[in-house]
Amino acid sequence: MESSGRVVIYLTRHGKTILNTLDRVQGWADSPLTEEGALVAHDLGHGLKGTNFVAAYASDRGRAIETARIVMKESENHHLKLEQLPEIREFGFGKFEGEYNQTVLKMVAKAHGFESIESYYDKTAANNSNIVIDTVHKMDETGMTENSAIFEKRLAAGLDTILQDTQNRGGGEVLVVAHGMVIHRIIEMIDPSKNLRIIENASVTKVIFENGAYSIEEPGNMFYVEAGKKAQGGV
């Protein structure tokens, strides 16, 4: 990577956790990686061998930290210090933490007059995390949730920190392990046309900063996981 200040963020979702497996809401709440979740993080790390990261970041949730450490080790970037950023922590679901995902999504859909979140998306052509964020914020009376503006401001601050730190190093490639809603919202902030319905565990979305602007490449890409499996003799 030339020292032009170009920054390539490998924005990665953490490996599958216990709460993911149970299909329960996991925002600020946390649970450890499952065996499958750790394995996919190992695969990702092997797939990223040869990528010389100049820095590594994770949210301050254990699942992101655990994933990042596995990826750093397997990709031979374990010499880096892992920086923890609360700014890229997942959206907090307040009283809905630990609830079944489908229960919450159905409540969100009904708040907008639809029977399911799928029918809401299909009939409105919406694919925007703000729908869920702002509806959950309104339904949660505990005051523990954020609205979309506050959530976006927090994420922007995290991106700014990563960008400034990396440019101070002359630019380069950076590993960032975060969460599903975080990745959705960052994509929407930069290029909504690149957003996906689902961000898979251990997928990589490239966030590039060059010539004064951000762009999104390869959203939700599982290429590195698949490459890592093949490198280890897997299918």
Model-derived regions, located:
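Acidic, low-complexity terminal tails and accessory targeting/binding regions
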Residues: 1-7, 91-103, 164-172, 184-235
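Phosphate-coordination/substrate-recognition cap region in phosphate-metabolizing enzymes
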Residues: 3-4, 45-121
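An N-terminal RHG(E/S)-centered segment typical of histidine phosphatases
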Residues: 1-53, 61-62, 69-73, 77, ...
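Amphipathic, non-transmembrane alpha-helical scaffold segments
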Residues: 34, 38, 61, 121-122, ...
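Beta-strand elements within well-structured catalytic alpha/beta cores of enzymes
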Residues: 8-12, 57, 83, 169-178
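Short glycine/proline- and acidic residue-enriched helix-loop micro-motifs
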Residues: 111-150
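A mid-sequence, solvent-exposed acidic-amphipathic segment
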Residues: 138-169
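Short active-site segment of divalent metal-dependent hydrolases/proteases
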Residues: 17, 182-183
